[in-house]
Amino acid sequence: MKHHTVKHRFGHIVVVRCICLIFSIAASSIALANPYKITVLATNISDYGGLGEWSFSALFEAEKESVLFDTGFKSDTVLHNVLHLGVDLSKVEKVVLSHFHSDHTGGLLVLRDYFVEANPKALSTVYVAKGFFKQRVTAEGVEVGPGSFTSAITFKSEAEKRGINFIEIGSPTEIAPALWLTGPVPRKVEAYNGPKGLFIDVDGQATPDIIMDDQSLGYLTPKGWLMTSGCGHAGLINTGEVLQGIEDAPVVSIVGGFHLWRASNQVLSQTADWLENAGLELMMGGHCTGIAAAETIASQLGLPRSHISHAAIGSVITPDLKIIRSSVE
């Protein structure tokens, strides 16, 4: 699939303004051609009837094309929640797995099994970043894989038996109108953000795993980027800079897990500074972000109460980037 980046470099100020105006209109038209409603399907907090767990999943839903981002931890959590919410995934053909961890990959096979009868193509194209299928092991040599599997290859094989096709992303790629995957994120600011204790083989040597297959989804709206991460192991700042390398636009909203729940005050301050400079207006942290961490960032930025939420099952961000249902109203 083709992908592109756009940069404007013109010497004459009038030409710059004209070109930027034309591009702005074009970018808006692309985004508005398939505006997405974002619904949280798995995270730590739930209302009556939903299932909360340590995981993440969200649906980017639009008239022309929709994309499922991550699939939760336990095999049936997201299935339970979509049935509870009345969300139909049978028309959704594309799935993004943010990284190999089981709390983001656990529901894929059950969801495919459930919705395939209604649509043979349902949830059949799965995007993963390069390195997703590398085998992880503990220091004791115990294998750890995606979902409930110890073997990454077995997980892949079981998915392919169900008609799932994996596409490995190596660089920023547009997978649906105005939806961009970062692919593996260069670690320029944050080196690694996440748990330790797993290893991968690099040239015959057991090397600490820093989850280079961590990728995020960017939605290029008329206002700027909406960035969604499953865990943000690559670092929020690093990820945001990849999106701004695709198109130099503000990062107006962040959604999902950013693994800041154990972050130091220094890291939170650095993150808040970057987000403020990037133009953040709306924040819906969930999963591993941490409520206290999110509140700290929101306070430093001075975000109004209506612009920060802690995601719950059924939380929604509307196509015009407003929170209409959340755990914190």
State where each predicted segment sits:
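N-terminal secretory signal peptides that target proteins for export/translocation
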Residues: 1-15
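Active-site-proximal loop/helix segment associated with metal-binding centers of metalloenzymes
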Residues: 148-150, 173-222
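Pre-active-site segment of Zn-dependent metallo-hydrolases
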Residues: 51, 64-94, 117, 193, ...
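Boundary at the C-terminal end of the N-terminal hydrophobic targeting segment
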Residues: 31-33
